[in-house]
Regions:
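ER/secretory pathway lumenal C-terminal domains and tails of membrane proteins involved
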Residues: 1-111, 117-191, 203-589
């Protein structure tokens, strides 16, 4: 049930399908999307379906000189029309599209036509009941029609009463504000570029630029589209108040079918070094002064007129650093000294695709004059190994020439993050009680709460306690738990750690208690399932047990008595889990 599915509202049916519904965790039980129709629309539609298929009309005909009454099966003809509308816009589309599992969202909007067809049968169901009562009840046709209309009106009323609250987006401005927060995380000067990936990361930013006029000096670059020539053409043109992105390639070098991908062949590195050693002048003329300089690799290899050279001949690229440009760029100095070269590791990569090459081209050409960012929600598989050079500034990671994943290097600009969160961010009116937060919006709320918790922890590590407390209080006010429940995924334990380090253990205890309650409720629910469904929920059980273990660790920093109580509860639940054949990873081998 936590992943969707349907329920009837009748406990004897639902319990047999999905386990004891009374043991559902509170955040599922109280979710506004937890709707029950008691099968009323289904039953009404089936009544209409069968009535239409079997409907006949009486008529009198003369046979063998006698007047007789016969039935004409006219309903079946109409039935096939509606049925094929239902089939072709529903099941036929399912078969034709043959969608892969693990779709990013429910695709029910693709089958809207089949819902229209079934709605016709629901309407005919009303006629079917009227027709039946006219034959059985001793009432006038008008009275029967009125009574049936009133009774069957309960079906759409029930549907509306159940689904209205989880379709009500009024007073919720999260999409606009969260998109704006990404733009507000960017440097205010320098026409920054931000790489995004996917619809939910990109469209809110485009909306803010197009409609609200926010962040029009920035360029939003969607990595999913950057694989195509038409989108690269767009990036090479100015937009709003943003100049074109620094891509110098002529169109023939990135048009469709050209440089779709380029293999990474580190084995060629030694041969090139030997060539430079034996014949340096010829080598420099052919491949540039520095063979593995990013600009030279893109120019002399990837864009070579010789197709045999369309490779990346190394797994380590370099960008020579203009140190004065870095100092003027506005970025945080991640270490005491600016490196002579930026190192871009391609370790583990077998090929770079067109979008990757365009990212590298922008880095090679920008010379740190234009800040380049990657949205926090972009997966690491989409930006090569550039994460080694990130400095986080709010909801974005800034690409810098520094290697920031080594000891002693800074990878979080707390001053900019604090400024952005406290003065520039908006939170979509999440403070208003009663808002419906759907699954996708909830994920973005989680991202924001985790960001605030992470910022507070970073500030505390820098002994900036007052600013950290400001951030923690901001999270409590702007992302309240009555709209965005506190659990592990929403950053509940990080918030607790922040309050502990800030010296306010009572606030930390509130977060710990809520994380524990949610995790224990989920585990208890999984343990109540039948053997088959319990086996399917093994990974979910393991995840909740690990969350509870982490919660115990944080609880021990707050109150030993509470931590001991949690440990006892966890041991009891784990005993039940183990008794049903459950095992933790690597256990029992």
């Amino acid at each position: 049930p936590e992943h969707g599915n349907w329920i009837t509202g009748f406990s004897f049916i639902d319990d047999s399908l999905y386990g004891d519904q009374s043991k559902l965790p509170d955040d599922l039980k109280n979710n506004k999307g937890h709707n029950v129709f008691y099968c009323m629309p289904l039953i009404l539609g089936l009544i209409g379906l069968f009535w239409q298929a079997w409907y006949t009309r009486k008529r009198k005909v003369i046979k063998n000189g006698k007047e007789v009454e016969e039935s004409l099966p006219i309903g079946i003809q109409q039935f096939w029309v509606v049925f094929f509308l239902f089939f072709m816009t529903g099941l036929a589309i399912v078969i034709y599209l043959n969608q892969t599992p693990m779709q990013p969202r429910e695709r029910d909007y693709a089958y809207a036509g089949s819902f229209y067809a079934y709605a016709i049968w629901c309407g005919l169901g009303v006629l079917a009941i009227i027709d039946l009562l006219k034959k059985k009840a001793k009432l006038s046709g008008t009275a029967i029609s009125a009574i049936v209309a009133v009774i069957t009106l309960l079906v759409p009323i029930q549907m509306a009463s159940q689904t209205w609250d989880d379709h009500d987006r009024s007073n919720r401005y999260t999409c606009r504000d969260f998109g704006q927060n990404y733009l507000m995380s960017l440097q205010e000067k320098g026409n920054p570029i931000i790489f995004t990936n996917g619809d939910n990361d990109t469209f809110p930013l485009w909306y803010n630029q197009e409609v609200e006029g926010v962040g029009t000096d920035a360029r939003v670059c969607n990595l999913s589209y950057l694989q195509t020539d038409w989108y690269i053409d767009q990036m090479k043109r100015p937009a709003y108040n943003s100049p074109s992105v620094p891509i110098t390639w002529p169109r023939l070098d990135f048009c469709s079918g050209t440089n779709e991908y380029v293999t990474v062949e580190p084995g060629a590195k030694q041969q090139i070094l030997e060539f430079y050693k034996q014949n340096p002048e010829a080598a420099k003329k052919q491949f540039g002064d520095e063979p593995f300089e990013l600009k030279n690799v893109l120019k002399y290899w990837v864009r070579s007129k010789n197709p045999d050279l369309h490779i990346i001949p190394t797994d380590t690229l370099y960008v020579t650093i203009d140190k004065e440009a870095v100092k003027k760029s506005g970025m945080m100095m991640a270490s005491d000294t600016i490196p002579d070269k930026m190192v871009i590791s391609l370790a583990g990569k077998t090929a770079l695709y067109k979008g990757d090459l365009m990212m590298l081209e922008m880095i090679a050409q920008c010379n740190w004059v234009r800040p380049i960012y990657v949205a926090l929600t972009v997966g690491e598989e989409n930006y090569m190994n550039l994460g080694d050079n990130f400095v986080q500034e709010g909801l974005v990671n800034r690409i810098t020439p520094f290697t920031t994943n080594k000891p002693g290097a800074k990878n979080f600009d707390t001053e900019k993050a604090y400024h952005n969160i406290m003065t520039r961010f908006k939170f979509g009116n999440l403070k208003q009680k009663g808002l419906y937060i759907d699954e996708t919006t909830m994920r973005m709320c989680y991202t924001h709460r985790r960001l605030l918790a992470q910022t507070a922890l970073q500030l505390l590590s820098e002994h900036k306690n007052k600013k950290a407390i400001d951030i923690l209080k901001k999270a409590d006010v702007e992302i309240p738990d009555y709209n965005v429940p506190i659990d592990y995924m929403s950053g509940g334990l990080d918030m607790a750690r922040g309050w502990i380090l800030a010296g306010q253990k009572q606030k930390a205890a509130e977060y710990v208690g809520k994380v524990w309650k949610t995790a224990s409720q989920y585990l208890s629910y999984y343990l109540s399932l039948d053997a088959n469904r319990f086996a399917q929920a093994q990974n979910d059980c393991i995840r909740q047990i690990m969350i509870m273990q982490s919660t115990c660790e944080v609880a021990s920093m707050v109150d030993q008595k509470t931590a001991k109580k949690y440990e006892d509860q966890l041991n009891k639940l784990y005993t039940l889990y183990h008794g049903r054949g459950g095992q933790m990873p690597n256990a029992g081998n």
